[in-house]
Structure formats: C-alpha cells, structure tokens
C-alpha cells in the first residue's frame, strides 16, 4: 500500500513544484514588465527634459543670434586661415586635421540634426565615403589600392556634389562650414598625400634608382581602371542598396507617420518642385509614382560620370591643382551669393514674422499717428484748456 502511495505523493509533490516554478516565472515576467514600464517612463521623461532644454537653448540662441554669428564668422575666418597656413607649411599633417575635424563636428551635427529631424541625412553617401576615408587614414595609410578607391570618392562624387549642389562657404554659419568641409577636405587630404607629402616623395624617388617611380604604383591601365573606377562603383552600389533597405523598407512606416522627418530625397524633391527646375522635370519622366526610382537612377549616372573624371585628375598634378582651385572658388562664390542674395531676404522675412507676432495693442500704438509736439501746437492746446475751465 505504501508502495502505491509513493508515486502518488511524488506526483503531487512534482505538481506542487511545477506550480511553484510556474508562479515564479509569472512573478519574474511581471517584474520584467514593470521594469520595462519604469524604464520607458524614465526615458520619456528624460526625452521631454532634453527637448525642453533644447527649445530653451534655441530661444536663447535666437535672442543672441547676431552676436553668435559674429563670433562664428571670426572663428571661421581664423580657422580657415590657419588651415591654409598649415596646408603650405606642413602638408603631411593635413590628414590628422581632417580626422580631428570629423571626430568633433560630425557627432555634434548628429545631435543638432536629431533635434531638427534631419538625422537621416547622415546616411547619405558623403558620410559613408568619409567613414571609409577614416579607415584608410587611421588603419591602412599605406594601402595603395584603398587609397585609390578613396581618391576616386573624394575627387569624384563628393567634389562634384560641392559644385552641383551649390554648397556655400559662409563663415557665420557652422552648419554651412561643416557641409562644405565634409565635401572639400577629403580631396585636399588626398591631394597632399598624392603630391605634397614628404613620405610620398621618398616613395616616388627611391634612393639608388634613376627612374621616377610613383605612389600609388600603377602597374598598367587595367589596374588604374579597376581601382579608380570599377571598385569604387561597386562600393557605391553597395551603399545605395543599404540606404534603400534602411530608409525605404525598414524605416518606411516611421517616415510616413512623420512628414517633418527629412531625407535627402525629400529635401531635394521639395526644392526642385518649388523651383520647377530641370531636376524636377527629369525625375518626373517616368511619372510621379516613380520619382524615387528616377532619383536613384540620376544619382547613379552622376556617380558614374564623376568617378570616370577622377582618372585624368589622378594622372596629372596640374589638372589636380586646378581642380582644387575650382572647388574652393565654387564654395566661396556660392557663399557670396548666399550673403548678398539669400540672407537679406531671410532677414526681411524674420523681421516680418516678428512684427506679426507682436501683441495687437503694441501694433495699434505704433500705427496711431503721433500728435504734433511743436511749441505752437502746445500753446494752442493750453489756451483751449484754460478757456474750457473758465466756461
């Protein structure tokens, strides 16, 4: 009898232990859910606090906008002058200046763009290419093939984007300075490494040889074509695929929910539609529903064409030097156009908005005609008052 009861007792005890384990799992899941809820609340509170602080800082910056612009202009001019001096005095240090610039200003730009809902701009090709530049300069500075790929990016799509998209060198705007330097600095870096770096000179003029070598060493035309044209295009199409998957597939619903979030396509199509220019007409060749596809095709054609132009630039020092002057001149010219044509209109619009936001009674006070304060008018008023008192 006892033998028969043992399995029953064991079964009951096992059942009790199973219930206990089940209860423990429920308790743990409740605790996890509570912890998640607490963390989400804390995250939302932190986000609200940060957004309030950001709005407060933005308002304070707007109040002192004139002073901030003057300080930015001063520092921008001094920094650009110092960079030009360093470019002539110690060209071998220019890559380190570029790396320092990238590690300081790109994270700051992400914070600023995140607040403005522009952070998807940091998925653009220029940031992808700049990341590859950092890998080359910091990890593989003597890799000739990677250098040629980076050279093709820097003096191809990035350099011509500076000209075609009219990036403006405006020293009073940190955002515009950073936009220009992201496209301009890489080309200057690889120009100095290619032609002005003392280490490159040693490789080009090795001791004990009468002939002139080159760095990077180009074996034949097929080698040049492969590493200056084909491989960069493969890397570009890889970026295009990743960009499409992230923006148009993975984050599609997020972008549809919030039309204020900007991407490069949204920004360019918005400007092109407003101006009704050639880009807007070209992007509509396949219909409005296929504008995104046309934008990708046009960008691919632009990349292929500008990448092909890097081959003669790579082979000629004179042509490469002239191209540097062309890029800087275009950025300065666009900056002058912005200061003389665009900025005055922006100032007028800001003043108009400020006047519209003023209280109605202040506007009424300013709109009322002022009374004549001349001595004759004052005398007439005094006589009128006295005569009224006598009556």
From Swiss-Prot:
* Keyword flag Transferase: yes
Transmembrane stretches in the record are: 67-87, 93-113, 120-140, 145-165, 173-193, 227-247, 295-315, 319-339
Quote the cellular component terms of the Gene Ontology held in the record: membrane
Kindly give the membrane topology term recorded for this protein. Answer: Multi-pass membrane protein
> What's one GO BP annotation on this UniProt entry?
phosphatidylcholine biosynthetic process
Q: What's the Enzyme Commission number for this chain?
A: 2.3.1.-
Keyword annotations: Acyltransferase, Lipid biosynthesis, Lipid metabolism, Membrane, Phospholipid biosynthesis, Phospholipid metabolism, Transferase, Transmembrane, Transmembrane helix
- Give the residue ranges for region: Disordered: 354-391
Which of the residues are on side Cytoplasmic?
1-66, 114-119, 166-172, 248-294, 340-391
Domain of life assignment: Eukaryota
- Catalytic reactions of this protein: sn-glycerol 3-phosphocholine + an acyl-CoA = a monoacyl-sn-glycero-3-phosphocholine + CoA; sn-glycero-3-phosphoethanolamine + an acyl-CoA = a monoacyl-sn-glycero-3-phosphoethanolamine + CoA; sn-glycerol 3-phosphocholine + hexadecanoyl-CoA = hexadecanoyl-sn-glycero-3-phosphocholine + CoA; (9Z)-hexadecenoyl-CoA + sn-glycerol 3-phosphocholine = (9Z-hexadecenoyl)-sn-glycero-3-phosphocholine + CoA
A molecular function GO annotation:
acyltransferase activity
Job of this protein: Glycerophosphocholine acyltransferase (GPCAT) that utilizes acyl-CoA to acylate glycero-3-phosphocholine (GPC), forming lysophosphatidylcholine (LPC). Shows broad acyl specificities with a preference for 16:0-CoA, polyunsaturated acyl-CoA, and the hydroxylated ricinoleoyl-CoA. Also catalyzes the acylation of glycero-3-phosphoethanolamine (GPE) with acyl-CoA. In addition to acyl-CoA, GPCAT efficiently utilizes LPC and lysophosphatidylethanolamine (LPE) as acyl donors in the acylation of GPC.
Belongs to which family? Belongs to the GPC1 family.
What is the official name of this protein in its record? Glycerophosphocholine acyltransferase 1
The protein's organism comes out as Ricinus communis (Castor bean)
Q: Organism classification, top ranks?
A: Eukaryota, Viridiplantae, Streptophyta, Embryophyta, Tracheophyta
